[in-house]
Amino acid sequence: GFLLLKNLSKKYNSNFLLKDKLKSSCSEFIINGSTYRLFLPNTFMNNSGDAVRAIVDWYKINLDQIFIIVDDKDLPLGKIRFRKKGSSGGHNGLKSIIEKLQTHNFNRIRIGIGSPPSIKGTNKFNTISHVLGNISLEEKSILDKVYRRVIESLEQLNNKKEEIIINEL
């Protein structure tokens, strides 16, 4: 999720600035007269709901205007899934957000990063290294295409109905 937001921010020549009271770094830019804000929570993923709650309260944001973007190890690499509401699906970051917002009703985009490889000789997985570690050139190529697709779809939100965007993703 962070890589996608950094790519989008870079595209619009915007930098992320630390916003301590929002427990996040924020990038702000304008597309077709509409202001967009991207936030990178500075919390641990399991506490990302603290940052989202602070952002919603500070900016008085309607939940239908929020798009939470997460990496999902349970989706194949490059798969995109959009939902307007739903459970956390076992994702601890989404679980934290649902708890702090006290609702399941917010937009979320899951980007598949594939399952982590098992640790040699065991049935255990090194999830943290997989999610936070370096990606191969092949994975980067796949994710770059996914990021372009998601960014193009998000940019069209003012011009198209949300349902059309969902179908395109």
Where are these regions (language model features)?
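Nucleotide and nucleotide-moiety/phosphate-recognizing core
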Residues: 1-84, 95, 99-110, 117-129, ...
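Phosphate- and other anionic-substrate recognition elements at nucleic-acid/protein interfaces
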Residues: 88
